[in-house]
Amino acid sequence: PVVCLFLILSIGISHGSLDNQKGKKLSQLYNIKKSYFFYLIYFLVGISIIIFWLFFPTISLILFLVLASYHFGKEDTEFLVNNENVSNLILYFLKGALIIIAPLIFHFVETINIFKLLLIQNEKFYSFLNFIEENNILLFALSISLLSNIYYFLKDFKTTNILIFLDFFSVIVLNYFLTPLIAFTVYF
């Protein structure tokens, strides 16, 4: 776990270093001249998220998982998309949800234990996860994610669209054979 955490943090920090470029674009968009203003807001948002997590860990985790699903779906797919519309936003979420769904399907108990390490003590949350696992709702969600991948594969077909399925099946294989933390580290 320590090695995985180190890799995620070190790679994640370099991945997050691109936020500086996004900050410059936002500053230009909103006509903000002082760059320190972006960093101040960035820092305050980070601190606010940590405080919010400490007081409302379950809500924070749910919001994080929803945003992560959208983020991963968009990052893995945007090279195929020419325009941003509501249907693409939904498809990004459905595609990216695979990153959240796969560990729950293949390593349910271990994934729950990771959630508990993140200060999630809400029994209703765990009852809900047990319900969706026992009633095969996770498999249904996996099927929906697969359908979003098929849509992107067939839409404006190019040879590069094959990457969509390589991505989908690599996430499945990683999560089938590896623990959730190692699978996510390799994916990330």
Mark where each language-model region is:
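Short aromatic-rich membrane-water interface segments that cap or initiate transmembrane helices
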Residues: 123-137
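Short juxtamembrane and helix-loop transition motifs at transmembrane-helix boundaries
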Residues: 17-32, 57-58, 141-154
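Membrane-interface helix-loop-helix junctions at boundaries between adjacent transmembrane segments
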Residues: 47-105, 116-124
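Transmembrane helix interruption/hinge and helix-loop junction motifs
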Residues: 1-2, 51-61, 175-184
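Multi-pass membrane catalytic core of lipid/isoprenoid biosynthesis enzymes
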Residues: 32-56
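Alpha-helical transmembrane segments of multi-pass integral membrane proteins
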Residues: 69, 75, 91-111, 134-152, ...
